[in-house]
Amino acid sequence: AVSAGLVDLEDYRSLDIVYGEQKATPWPKPVAEPRFRVFPVEFAQAVRNFCLQGGNVFLSGAYIGTDLKDDPERREFAENILKYAWRTDYATRGGAVYTQNALLFGKDLDFNFVTEFHPKIYGAENPDGIEAAKNSGAQTVMRYAENNVSAAVAYNGEEYNTVIMGFPFECIEEREYRDMLMKAILDFFENDQDIRQNTPKDGRKKSSLNN
């Protein structure tokens, strides 16, 4: 709807982009471009304009880095506008996450998202590890507990803010944590508080995969 011009983003202050497990799906025969890409050109342009006009973006999804890492144009958009970069796929098997910014979340949180069969929530088997784009001013605000790979980043800018998660928000198992995280993100967008802090680059546990 946004790409087709049916929704005017100027009517909104913040945008929640839910990509879930969406990724490019090729046709069986080379008759057309792959469908369901993360950030097709028209949508990326609309989000770019939204941010540059002061709009905030909360983005989550399992393939938000993997799906665009080999496309220079979409990668430039992710790094320069949303302020995140792909680091790895298959970033965690168990889905355990911890937060790393008390200024944003109010306190340290440990939670899990679903990666396997669940009767009520689909499993995100192959989430992305994402990190702050180089020289972007963004920072890691969540990590995967099993290896300390960056799981989410936030950008506190002069014109707009972003929070980017490399796993689907809706896959977080406990509603209590979904509520707490969403409230913290919306408060960050609404109040524009400064969340910049000096945090160890390797998180609170040691691993050969630390950034």
Each predicted region: which residue ranges?
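A glycine-rich, often tryptophan-bearing local segment used as a flexible ligand/cofactor-contacting loop or short
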Residues: 23-124, 136-138, 143-145
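Extracellular ligand-binding/catalytic regions of CAZymes and related secreted enzymes
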Residues: 56, 69, 73-97, 134-211
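Surface-exposed charge patches
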Residues: 48-49, 131, 153
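Structured loop/turn residues at beta-strand edges in well-structured enzyme cores
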Residues: 10
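A short, well-structured beta->alpha microelement
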Residues: 1-7
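Structural motif
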Residues: 13-23, 58-59, 162-166
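Structured segments of extracytoplasmic/periplasmic soluble domains
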Residues: 18, 49-53, 188-192
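Phosphate/NTP-binding elements of NTP-utilizing enzymes
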Residues: 128-134
